[in-house]
Swiss-Prot record:
It comes from Methanococcus maripaludis (strain C5 / ATCC BAA-1333). InterPro entries: Nucleotide-bd_a/b_plait_sf, Ribosomal_uL23, Ribosomal_uL23-like, Ribosomal_uL23/eL15/eS24_sf, Ribosomal_uL23_CS. SUPFAM superfamilies: Ribosomal proteins S24e, L23 and L15e. The lineage of its organism: Archaea, Methanobacteriati, Methanobacteriota, Methanomada group, Methanococci. NCBIfam families: PRK14548.1 (NF011118), uL23_arch (TIGR03636). GO terms for molecular function: rRNA binding; structural constituent of ribosome. Belongs to the universal ribosomal protein uL23 family. Pfam families: Ribosomal_L23 (PF00276). Part of the 50S ribosomal subunit. Contacts protein L29. Keywords: Ribonucleoprotein, Ribosomal protein, RNA-binding, rRNA-binding. Binds to 23S rRNA. One of the proteins that surrounds the polypeptide exit tunnel on the outside of the ribosome. This is Large ribosomal subunit protein uL23.
């Protein structure tokens, strides 16, 4: 699966901004069929950042969210800034 097909769009809200600042986490809508390994590879390819942990959930509307925790040596704020959301 192509990295651009896996990661659909970042989720920008007050809650996600707090996660970026305090927990070094990013939140994206991802392809519903994407596995955690697919998401990890896409983050590495698109943002050149190593992933420490991934939690996923499927919303009642059928969209899949990925909560991505970056390793300590990477800054989620810098990745968010490169996306233009921070």
């Amino acid at each position: 699966m192509d990295a651009f097909d896996v990661i659909k769009t970042p989720i920008v809200s007050e809650k996600t901004m707090k996660l970026i600042e305090e927990e070094n986490r990013l939140v994206f809508y991802v392809e519903r069929k994407a596995t955690k390994a697919d998401i990890r590879a896409a983050i590495k390819e698109l943002f050149d950042a190593e992933v420490a942990d991934i939690n996923t959930s499927i919303t009642p509307k059928g969209k899949k969210k990925a909560y991505i925790t970056l390793k300590a040596e990477y800054n989620a704020g810098e990745v968010a800034a490169s996306l233009g959301i921070y």
